[in-house]
Amino acid sequence: MNQVQHNAIVNFIWSIADDVLRDVYTRGKYRDIILPFTVLRRLDAILEPTKDKVLEMHQKLNEMKIDNQSAQLRKTSGYVFYNTSNYTFKRLLNEPGNIRQNLETYLDGFSSNVQDIISKFKLRNQLETLEEGNITFPLIEKFCSSTINLSPMPVTDKDGNVVMEGLTNLGMGYVFEELIRKFNEENNEEAGEHFTPREIIRLMTHLIFEPLKGKIKDGTYLIYDPACGSGGMLTEAEHFAKKLNPKATFHLYGQEVNPETYAICKADMLIKDE
């Protein structure tokens, strides 16, 4: 992802707050909506290509009276998470009059690992406020805009030409970090409270792994960050370590006291199948 694409995505998502949330939320509360909906839209875009196949498999398993469906649904979605509701962000827009109820159904359709993310964001607590302010529809509509692409797949025209590049997991991580930084500035919070700048992360990973050059053999290694924030340190450490030995396997572990940044980190890990 180049800087132009990065800035366009961040600026568009940032503009949603002023365009939709103003007069319903104070500026200090914008992050309570924008961050979880950004995460959900990313997950939604990732699952969209296999959505109908997941629904078909879910119906088939129900007809067979199979209760433990998780493994098969993960396999069908292609990821370690899935959604069994009939809705996507775009399909929610088809019934404006029932959008609150359908949004709840959509949230309930996610697998348990995504339910944890939704819970940490306390997103369900916001649904009544969104409904009372009549902004649920315009909020989802904005996140479905063709102006940005939060999917890892590129957008092409009818001739197959790429008109908008896909957003990689690393690029999505940068978007999250920039949004958090901007919200921190709005709320006069310390810049490093929720994430560490990438330049510092790269320096730290170099200091840790440079002495280990030639010592990382084939096998499985665990990387642990006891205060992982949004997961940037873990991602960069794995990226650097794999350069030292592409044949080695690395598993990432971390803990985080802030529920919001924990949710962002977990979403990133789920997408990357960590």
Walk through the language-model features, giving the residues of each.
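Non-catalytic, mostly N-terminal accessory regions of nucleic-acid modification and defense proteins
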Residues: M1-L212
